A protein has these predicted regions:
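C-terminal, non-catalytic "cap/extension" segments appended to globular domains
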Residues: 19, 24-31, 50-62, 79-83, ...
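Post-HExxH zinc-binding segment in Zn-dependent metallohydrolases
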Residues: 238-246, 365-401, 472
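Active-site metal-coordination segments of metallo-dependent hydrolases
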Residues: 360-374, 407, 461-469
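C-terminal motif of bacterial Sec signal peptides marking the signal peptidase cleavage site
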Residues: 13-14
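Contiguous, non-catalytic segments that form substrate-binding/exosite surfaces or channel walls
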Residues: 185-336
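Bacterial N-terminal signal peptides that target proteins for export
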Residues: 1-6
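N-terminal helix-rich structural modules
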Residues: 20-197, 464, 514, 528-529, ...
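Active-site recognition of the HExxH zinc-binding catalytic motif
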Residues: 337-353, 372-376
Length: 543
């Protein structure tokens, strides 16, 4: 055997220094990721039980057992993640580790105690917002009062919820009845805005929010940037869209209660064809015709009304091993408007079901415009005559369909601008800000004495979230246009649609930045051109 050379010996011995410890093996990180996914799965199942008011999961597992398992995994996960040296990882592994550590700290705290307070009583809303200094505490207080109030509205002797009442405005032929029904929303407005004075809960909240965000990019701006819309373009684009609506619709002013009637003709004509008992079945059939088998995708629903249920429709993970999307909404009636919302929430569900990535990235970019945009991929079809004829056996003229589609979208854009302007100047009178926006762009007669802006829970529960709907409308118009150009029309059904869209838009979870996914699909940056083109299909005349 030939003796080793001196340099080789020196290298082998490391010049007398101890060898550096080896980096974590792929198996070590993979084991941590597997434990992470197990922990998230358990927390998802607990959260869904709490949202549904149940004590047992569909498979019979009790909440107590789920909490016990979750509590036993959390410290093990924390130890595993803390023991990984991120400096020894490759770029993607380091990013995955960072995602898991942030999620553990932010979203995987102790399981909340079960609610033993009951749901029969109204929250205490006789409080002075000026004595509440914590932003999150005030937000929770306002939202609790808003949630209860919007579900217990009296109109013409009947108790209804906010969405049912607003749907009725679009169907009532009697202007005076519409006015009465609209004003029946006043308790909702007061739950947010009080008497629009120094004691207004919202005005106190927006002052605290503005102080907290001073000198920083607003959440709405950051979310839009992540989707590919630069903040310096955002407000300008929204104004351009609102101006286009103003130009293609009649200039005569309408009362706010008549706005819903004007934009609701499609709902008036077609809602009778969607009774409550058909609502979920029709939703399933529409997606089945697009190649998305909701049963096979494990989509679950909680749609029945009950006291204490959140007033906001939402979709979430009900498990991640495998992914089980859960849709929560409340429907007392059927109708076109509720079908549109259910198709939207199911759009979220099929997004979740299509995620195919490593455990650390098995999530969605929640609360961003892209997420809201792709949820509307199919929901927007309900306003197209061809879709209506295919699924409802009747249709309305295109102009009525487009008014139905954009009536809600343009209100969302107005709310997004409203929130931006209130954050810039929290001392402004919110009633006046809203009155100017809606009269200048939507031809709605100004009523600064009415706080009718104060009926979106997102304004208090998730500041900046209305911008997701607004920016999302721009993004989905571009995505739908691009899909038709690359894949073909899907308005009457297309069994290959889901299989084509899922790997191009839905599968990534957190694997790729939203902007990269969107611009890759579009072949370039986002622009409002597709939405503006769609708006201009609308004639000015009103039947």
């Amino acid at each position: 055997m030939r003796a080793a050379s001196l340099p080789a010996v020196i290298l082998a011995l490391g010049c007398g220094r101890p060898a550096a410890p080896p980096g974590p093996s792929p198996a070590t990180l993979a084991a941590a990721e597997s434990l992470y996914l197990d922990t998230r799965d358990l927390r998802d199942r607990i959260d869904v039980l709490d949202a549904s008011g149940a004590e047992k999961a569909p498979d019979g597992t009790t909440r107590a057992l789920l909490v016990h398992r979750y509590d036993s995994l959390r410290p093990r996960l924390a130890t595993r993640l803390a023991g990984v040296d991120s400096t020894s990882l490759g770029a993607d592994d380091a990013r995955a580790l960072g995602v898991m550590r942030r999620t553990l700290a932010r979203d995987l705290g102790e399981a909340p105690a079960p609610d033993t307070t009951g749901t029969a009583g109204a929250p205490d809303c006789a409080y002075d917002p000026r004595t509440v200094d914590a932003t999150d505490s005030l937000r929770a207080r306002i939202h609790a009062c808003y949630g209860w109030t919007q579900a217990h509205l009296l109109t013409d002797g009947d108790m209804v919820d906010r969405l049912t009442l607003l749907g009725g405005l679009g169907r009532s032929e009697d202007p005076e009845q519409r006015r009465r029904q609209f004003l029946a929303l006043a308790p909702v407005w007061r739950s947010m805005n009080g008497e629009n004075d120094a004691g207004s809960p919202y005005r106190r909240l927006i002052t605290l929010e503005a102080a907290r965000s001073r000198g920083r990019e607003l959440p709405a701006e950051a979310q839009a940037r992540a989707t590919g819309i630069e903040p310096d373009s955002l407000e300008r684009w929204l104004v351009a869209i609102l101006e286009t609506w103003r130009d293609v619709t009649p200039s005569a002013l309408v009362e706010p209660w008549d706005w819903y009637y004007q934009t609701g003709r499609a709902s008036r004509v077609l809602s009778a064809r969607i009774p409550l008992e058909r609502l979920a079945r029709l939703n399933d059939s529409v997606y089945q015709a697009l190649g998305a088998d909701l049963t096979g995708l494990r989509v679950r629903y909680d749609l029945a009304p009950r006291d204490g249920k959140t007033p906001v429709a939402f979709t979430t993970f009900g498990g991640r091993r495998p992914i089980v999307p859960w849709v929560f909404a409340t429907y007392r009636t059927g109708g076109l408007d509720n079908l549109n919302e259910l198709l939207h929430e199911t759009g979220h569900a099929i997004h979740l079901a299509a995620i195919r990535t490593r455990p650390a990235y098995t999530d969605w970019p929640d609360a961003d415009p892209f997420t809201e945009a792709v949820a509307d991929f199919i929901a927007l079809e309900v306003y197209e005559p061809a879709w209506q004829q295919r699924w409802l056996g009747d249709s309305v003229p295109l102009a009525d369909g487009l008014r139905g589609r954009y009536g809600a979208i343009l209100l969302d854009m107005s709310w997004a601008l409203f929130e931006l302007r209130m954050l810039r100047d929290p001392s402004a009178d919110p009633n006046l800000v809203w009155a100017r926006l809606t009269q200048d762009y939507l031809h709605i007669r100004a009523h600064p004495e009415l706080a009718w802006w104060a009926m979106r829970g997102q304004l208090v529960d998730e500041p900046g979230y209305m911008m997701n709907y607004a920016a999302g409308a721009i993004v989905i118009a571009a995505i739908r246009e691009r899909t038709r150009a690359r894949h073909g029309d899907f308005s009457r059904g297309d069994p290959g649609w889901y299989a084509w869209v899922a790997p191009r838009l839905y599968r990534y979870g957190l694997e790729r930045p939203t902007r990269e996914v969107v611009e890759g699909f579009l072949g370039g940056p986002v622009s409002p051109a597709a939405l503006l083109t769609d708006l201009r299909r609308m004639p000015r005349t009103v039947p």
